[in-house]
Amino acid sequence: MTAASEKTTRRFTIDCTKPASDSLISPSDLGAFLQQKIKCYTGKKEKLLHINANGNIVEVDVTGGFIGKQGLKWQIGRFLHMKKLRAFIKIFAQGLDGFELRYINVEEGKEE
């Protein structure tokens, strides 16, 4: 890594408003899962990764770029799979640094 990439900080936002309003998932549970599962350099996780759950939005601050948007999306997918919600909730991109969790309309996929 270069010195410039170590100092850059990216903030990812995960909007859990729709599933959290129905009490399917808790944003604090998602934040705790991400804190536990995201791998980092030994002993440096506290400095490089900060996760805050404010209301229905989870904010992930990453310093150094050790996890990107695709890796974070994969971890969110693992969380939904663990909660057995992967078949009902899909992860959509929301801008360059954000995600939104929405319900999948199962009826659209059926042919008549």
From Swiss-Prot:
Component of the large ribosomal subunit. Its main location: cytoplasm. GO terms for cellular component: cytoplasm; ribonucleoprotein complex; ribosome. Transmembrane segments: none annotated. It is found in: Cytoplasm. This is Large ribosomal subunit protein eL22. Keywords: Cytoplasm, Ribonucleoprotein, Ribosomal protein. Pfam families: Ribosomal_L22e. InterPro entries: Ribosomal_eL22, Ribosomal_eL22_sf. One of its GO terms (biological process) is cytoplasmic translation.
